Amino acid sequence: MACGLALKRPLQHEYESFLTDETYNGEAKRARTQCPPFRAQMGTIAATLPSTSTFAQKFKEQEESVFQAATLMTRLSRNQLKTYLSSEVKNLRKRKAIPRSNDFDDDGDQRGDGCSSNYSKAYRAPSSPKSGSDSEGEAPSTSVTDRSSAKREFTMANVQMICERLLKQQEIRLRNEFEMVLTKKLDEQHQQYVQFAAEQLNSKCVSTGDDYSYSYLS
């Protein structure tokens, strides 16, 4: 009710008479009668402010090593490493550097029926007339035993895990070497700068005749 009555008042006449009064400064009155600037809601302000996780992430990015950018660009993913190892295995098999095995397919994954397929290929039942004796049927069983004993010790997953660990160790070693070399170079440059500053100060002392023996470089 009060708000509605206040809006219905004829404020234009009162406002003009108030401004035409000579006892007061009109500019000051106009400045006082102006509405305050619009203030945004507190929820909008809070939404626009960055969260604590954003600050923590920025602070973490500043503290990261110089290797971070190079690591993201050059580090091999698991799929890339698996593809590389599979291609290397294929090349070695083509050059007959490693024997072919049916336990693993071309992608390097282990087959579930590898043992049964090897056994079915190696064992030949004495059904033909040429293999009437039992000794001929027992002979291929020894080859199955030899193949099972000569089974590879590492699968593709084991080789991939070993390569990942070796790459990680190599990365740590390179980082340590780089930090040592960088620290040594910075120390040498600092010593050269201190020596240069001392020589300049001594030459200035000799030319001007002033005594700077108690300077901050002493």
UniProtKB/Swiss-Prot annotation:
Keyword Signal belongs to the record: no
One cellular-component annotation, GO: chromatin
A GO BP annotation: meiotic sister chromatid cohesion
GO molecular function: DNA binding; transcription coregulator activity
Tissue: Localizes to somatic tissues throughout the body, including muscle cells. Expressed in lateral epithelial seam cells, the hyp7 epidermal syncytium, and multiple head and tail neurons.
Subunit organization: Interacts with hda-1, a component of the NuRD complex. Interacts with let-418, a component of the NuRD and MEC complexes. Interacts with the transcription factor ceh-18. Interacts with ima-2.
Protein's name in the database: Akirin
Organismal lineage: Eukaryota, Metazoa, Ecdysozoa, Nematoda, Chromadorea
